[in-house]
């Protein structure tokens, strides 16, 4: 099933042209997927950063995805 999903996604326009249908560049559409990397893409205050961190901890509590 995972392989089929990968095959299906590889046919997406953004993967062929390196741009989305709206013309957004590939590098702006895809991220590295590194923990905490969102901080490099958003300009937020320390207060907002703390709220985001707290929300993530709350929503993912018990999921096994947190440290």
UniProtKB/Swiss-Prot annotation:
Gene3D superfamilies: P-loop containing nucleotide triphosphate hydrolases. SUPFAM superfamilies: P-loop containing nucleoside triphosphate hydrolases (SSF52540). It comes from the Eukaryota. It holds the Pfam family Sulfotransfer_1. InterPro entries: P-loop_NTPase, Sulfotransferase_dom. 3'-phosphoadenylyl sulfate binds at residues 31-33. It is an enzyme of class 2 (transferase). Keywords: Cytoplasm, Transferase. The keyword Cytoplasm applies. It is found in: Cytoplasm. Its main location: cytoplasm. One of its GO terms (molecular function) is sulfotransferase activity. Its EC number is 2.8.2.-. GO terms for cellular component: cytoplasm. Belongs to the sulfotransferase 1 family. Sulfotransferase that utilizes 3'-phospho-5'-adenylyl sulfate (PAPS) as sulfonate donor. This is Putative cytosolic sulfotransferase 2. It comes from Arabidopsis thaliana. The gene is SOT2.
């Amino acid at each position: 099933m995972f392989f089929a999903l990968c095959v299906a996604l590889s046919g997406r326009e953004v993967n062929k042209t390196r741009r989305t249908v709206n013309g957004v560049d590939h590098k702006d559409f895809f991220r590295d997927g590194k923990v905490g990397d969102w901080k490099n893409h958003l300009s937020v205050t320390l207060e907002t950063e703390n709220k985001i961190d707290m929300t993530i901890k709350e929503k993912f509590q018990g999921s096994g995805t947190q440290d």
